[in-house]
Amino acid sequence: MSTVYETLYILRPDLTDEQVELAIAKYQNLLQEQGATDLEVQNRGKRRLAYEIKKQRDGFYVQFNYNAPGKAIAILERAMRLSEEVIRYLTVKQEVTKEKEDKVAVTA
């Protein structure tokens, strides 16, 4: 059973563009290995933080939207928690609107 999730995470500002791309690819591959589908990646770029986090004032914002089983979230968040490149992350379960449910039912 897959659920629609959105994960937003912030990477350290001192990473190079290549390191940012590698980090995005690492978490993208991790999700795909855990059975995530319809993965959309949005690199929102470097932005100023509203307040200081881990002595950082800026960060690279990255957003994932995807369908995945619940166990994939725990694995993804554990990897982010242990990583030194991620300074903050948040995963939320998306509400599926009635229109999308009807569209899924028609295509199935």
UniProtKB/Swiss-Prot annotation:
SUPFAM superfamilies, sorted: Ribosomal protein S6
Gene Ontology terms, MF aspect: small ribosomal subunit rRNA binding; structural constituent of ribosome
Gene Ontology CC: cytoplasm; ribonucleoprotein complex; ribosome
InterPro entries for the chain: Ribosomal_bS6, Ribosomal_bS6_CS, Ribosomal_bS6_sf, Ribosomal_S6_plastid/chlpt, Transl_elong_EF1B/ribsomal_bS6
Gene3D superfamilies per record: 3.30.70.60
Keywords: Ribonucleoprotein, Ribosomal protein, RNA-binding, rRNA-binding
Gene Ontology annotations of biological process type: translation
Function, as annotated: Binds together with bS18 to 16S ribosomal RNA.
Family membership: Belongs to the bacterial ribosomal protein bS6 family.
Descriptive protein name: Small ribosomal subunit protein bS6
UniProt source species: Nostoc sp. (strain PCC 7120 / SAG 25.82 / UTEX 2576)
Gene for this chain: rpsF
